Design a protein with these regions (language model features):
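N-terminal low-complexity, Ser/Thr- and acidic-residue-enriched intrinsically disordered segments
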Residues: 1-51
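Glycine-/proline-rich flexible loop or hinge segments
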Residues: 9-14, 48-52, 71-84
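Short, solvent-exposed coil/turn elements at secondary-structure transition points
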Residues: 11, 42, 48, 60, ...
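Extended, hydrophobic alpha-helical segments
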Residues: 24-34, 64-65, 72, 84-88
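Short, glycine/charge-rich beta-strand/loop segments that flank catalytic centers
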Residues: 40-52, 111-117, 152
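Charged, often glycine-rich, active-site loop that binds/positions anionic groups
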Residues: 43-71
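A general "terminal functional-core" signal
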Residues: 69-286
Length: 286
């Protein structure tokens, strides 16, 4: 891999074993750790920067509970241990690092982060702990940001958090989902498209990309593979090539994260392969 991919073992350090807390390690093993960059050693973003940005974006009680095991620490659906906080901190640093890398070098970069888009500023939800997408968008200050949320479920936590932080005027979000879980109130630049067949899904991808502000400074791509089995692996792989080629053709930096994808629908090997399709498509534009 020539493009930068961020990950470290803290991404999988939580005691609670679930796809969200484990699959990134399997993906890192599959592509080879020589292709991985540790966000904790990244020159663009230090862990203390990520900590500061998380603290800035979250409510004070949720921030403290995540670090200490307080009442809201299990709102993501996981039993708490300190590894949950370290996972969220390092994963968020990875999203920030990938975004900085993409912007500084006008390229593509990724983080093997997941468990982001349902979390809000004052609680986790739906296996999501800290919304690294919203935290990163907030950190980018005056830049225009486009979030493409192509997960089986809607990214309502992100949109609600953008509105809470009062940055939704410069951060647009477009969802393509297979159901309305975690839907949000839509407007012109924050909207949802539901697609439940391969043909409709492909149309939705092309039509959604045409909505993106051509002057956006960066795309944050939440690249879920959990539309499978409603949507075929082949169509999802085609989606990845379409998204990354579109970003390259429009000269827009793009940073991606893993989003959903679960062994309840397929084997771990199949799940890893489907996520590696995202990495391969990103690599094709370097």
């Amino acid at each position: 891999m020539k493009h930068t991919i961020y990950w470290n073992e803290k991404y999988t350090g939580a005691e609670h074993a679930f796809d969200t807390t484990r699959k990134s390690g399997e993906i890192a093993d599959a592509i080879g750790h020589e292709h991985i960059t540790d966000p904790a050693s990244n020159g663009h973003v230090a862990l203390h920067n990520a900590n500061d940005e998380i603290k800035k974006a979250l409510s004070a009680d949720y921030y403290e509970d995540l670090k200490t095991g307080g009442p809201k620490s299990q709102s993501n659906g996981f039993a708490w241990d300190y590894g949950i906080w370290e996972m969220a901190l390092n994963s968020t640093a990875g999203v920030m690092s990938a975004t900085a890398e993409a912007i500084v070098n006008n390229t593509v970069a990724g983080s093997l982060s997941s468990g982001l888009h349902h979390a809000h500023h004052n609680n986790g939800a739906g296996f999501c702990t800290v919304n690294g997408l919203a935290v990163t968008a907030n950190w980018l200050n005056s830049l225009h940001v486009t979030i493409l949320d192509f997960d089986a479920h809607c990214g309502g936590g992100t949109v609600k958090m953008l509105r809470h932080l009062n940055i939704d005027s410069r951060v647009e979000q477009y969802d393509i989902s297979t159901n309305y879980f975690d839907e949000y109130e839509e407007d012109e630049t924050h909207n949802i498209r539901i697609a439940r067949s391969d043909a409709d899904y492909t149309d939705a991808v092309n039509e959604t990309l045409n909505k993106v502000n051509p002057n956006t400074n960066v795309i944050l791509y939440n690249a879920g593979t959990d539309p499978y089995p409603t949507i075929s692996h082949e169509t999802l792989a085609e989606r990845e090539h379409t998204v990354f080629q579109w970003a390259k053709q429009h000269n827009i930096p793009i940073a991606y994260v893993l989003a959903g994808g679960y062994t309840s629908a397929q084997t771990m090997d199949s799940l890893v392969d489907s996520h590696v399709n995202t990495l391969d498509a990103a690599e094709s534009i370097v």
